[in-house]
Amino acid sequence: MIVDDSAIVRQVMQAILNKDPGIEVISAVADPIFAMNRMAIQWPDVIVLDIEMPRMDGVTFLRKIMAERPTPVVICSTLTDKGAETTMQALSAGAVSIVTKPKIGLKDFIQDAASDITNAVKAAAKANMSNIRAPKAAVKVREKNGVESLIPCGASAMSKTTEHVVAIGTSTGGTQALEFLLKALPTNAPGIVVVQHMPEKFTASFAERLDSICDIRVSEARHNDRVLPGHALIAPGGKHMMLKRSGAQYLVEIIDGPLVNRHKPSVDVLFRSTAKCAGKNAVGFILTGMGDDGARGLKDMLDAGAPTIAQDEKSCVVFGMPKEAIALGAAGKILPLAQIPQEIMRYAHLKD
């Protein structure tokens, strides 16, 4: 089902999805009220949902769906700061992935992004909705303008050099998995670098949201940011992130370049660079997601002496990326999501 107040979007998206023999669009409606009437007759397997619509917004509709009958939802959002912020609310409420659209040139854009849209719907159709977690804990508000923020970056960084790096890669279902994982970590966690498949603009909002609810710091990575204990760096959408070493410091390098495994940022790019410059001083985790991005990079990490862990099938929203890594022999361990925070801290204490 397509729910979008733009007739052009509905028309073009319906034509694109119906071209795939594995997809049937049962309806394309202008707003959530029409959608609910239609769903009373026939419930869809996947919903492609706009955010900003008349009569009822997409996030409100999404919450109603998740309360009544959890269903895979792909958010179709405009590439704006406001759209990114609202989309983060939708992902937190249970949406599984994002497809972006511009404010102008919609028809041409959707045609160009046909494969991305089709792949997003197919990935959503495989989602295990029992593993989509709505936030259970209240948002923790943490003061960020105190003494810590007044210490010059260089001084605090040099005194808090991380010797260990945790590299994490994830895609579909990863926003919920990362929220669960990072919220569980204490402030003495090792430095963390993350690739979450997500479009540009959205990663900044995602990092800000995580930072507001986690004890550790979370931010969108910038070129030459240091990897520090108690801090997670999220790769910016539309760029690759690589780990590099400068003396005793680990830094991240943010670069442009071609898509790798159809993605930018790519998990393989992060994992391979981590294997090269951190070796056995790193640990790699591949979490829920569609496709095979990260499998070969995780194998490189394992071959370089790093512990490597894949999320198990039962706890994944989509068991794609971990499955490929396991099949390649890249995973030294297979663990449920609930045990991964403890595994990160166990690794940190073993290395101390």
UniProtKB/Swiss-Prot annotation:
Q: Which Pfam families match?
A: CheB_methylest, Response_reg
Which Gene3D superfamilies does its entry note?
Answer: 3.40.50.2300, Methylesterase CheB, C-terminal domain
Q: How is it modified after translation?
A: Phosphorylated by CheA. Phosphorylation of the N-terminal regulatory domain activates the methylesterase activity.
UniProt xrefs under InterPro entries: CheB-like (IPR008248), CheB_C (IPR035909), CheY-like_superfamily (IPR011006), Sig_transdc_resp-reg_Me-estase (IPR000673), Sig_transdc_resp-reg_receiver (IPR001789)
Q: Name one GO cellular component term.
A: cytoplasm
The active-site annotation reads S171, H197, D293
The answer, when asked if Nucleotide-binding is one of the entry's keywords, is no
Q: Give a GO biological-process term.
A: chemotaxis
The residues covered by the Response regulatory domain are: 1-116
Q: Which UniProt keywords apply?
A: Chemotaxis, Cytoplasm, Hydrolase, Phosphoprotein
Q: Which domain of life is it from?
A: Bacteria
Q: Which GO terms describe its molecular function?
A: phosphorelay response regulator activity; protein-glutamate methylesterase activity; protein-glutamine glutaminase activity
Q: Where in the cell is it found?
A: Cytoplasm
Q: What EC identifiers does the entry list?
A: 3.1.1.61, 3.5.1.44
All copies of the CheB-type methylesterase domain together span 159-351
Give the record's family classification. Answer: Belongs to the CheB family.
Q: What is known of its domains?
A: Contains a C-terminal catalytic domain, and an N-terminal region which modulates catalytic activity.
Protein role: Involved in chemotaxis. Part of a chemotaxis signal transduction system that modulates chemotaxis in response to various stimuli. Catalyzes the demethylation of specific methylglutamate residues introduced into the chemoreceptors (methyl-accepting chemotaxis proteins or MCP) by CheR. Also mediates the irreversible deamidation of specific glutamine residues to glutamic acid.
Q: What is this protein called?
A: Protein-glutamate methylesterase/protein-glutamine glutaminase 2
Q: What organism is recorded for this protein?
A: Shewanella denitrificans (strain OS217 / ATCC BAA-1090 / DSM 15013)
Q: Which gene encodes it?
A: cheB2
